[in-house]
């Protein structure tokens, strides 16, 4: 995280020197099962646990002189408000539906996998053990947007850089894009689904929405959305590329946003 944030900081400073009006948004992803489990192991609440981590991150940013225009926390009230509006809209228009998830789950990556996606029975992203999971869940119709995603990559050749990573995502889509699990009933540490509160939002829908919630989309706290969106650049680690280049643009397509 320090590596990626430092690279973003350098780019933000360079663009400011060129005269651009820059909005640099580092963030912390604070919900999910691994946070809940680690907090329990330490004997503190999940909120206390993430508050301590965030304090350390902010101290590190000061030490390294890393700038930020707005520090985003996914536990912030305005972000929760935005996520609930986004989830409700996607459900009401039919892009989110209720089903049952049965398969494999990697807790460190917070990712669900089918049998065919595992590598030697382990998570294809991190190589760790997975465990069997079965629960009622809501799903986002990612598969509905497969053709539009491929066309996006073709029409905007530099949408994903470097080229090798773009080719990975194209291959992933062409092997058959599955709908994405977007809620949990077994993880209370998350944003409640407003119309079905026994469910909490799965962490990726929550986390990805921060890019627009931090600009005021779906809330009254900020009003920078029209000025700064769409973003000129997302700088992300290779381990979360799939979520940012497949799930996130598919969500934006569903919302009718650029």
Provide a role label for each language-model segment.
Residues 1-96, 110, 151, 251:
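N-terminal Rossmann-like or analogous alpha/beta NTP/dinucleotide-binding catalytic cores
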Residues 1-26, 73, 78-82, 108, ...:
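Structured secondary-structure scaffolds
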Residues 89, 105, 112, 122, ...:
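The −1 position to Zn-ligating cysteines in a subset of zinc-ribbon hairpins
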Residues 96-100, 130-131:
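A short alpha-helix-loop-beta-strand transition element characteristic
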Residues 102, 119-120:
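Short metal-coordination and nucleic-acid-contact micro-motifs, chiefly zinc-binding Cys/His arrays
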Residues 113, 129-130:
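Cys/His-rich microdomains that often coordinate metals
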Residues 120-121, 135:
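Predominantly a Rossmann-like dinucleotide-binding segment in NAD(P)-dependent oxidoreductases
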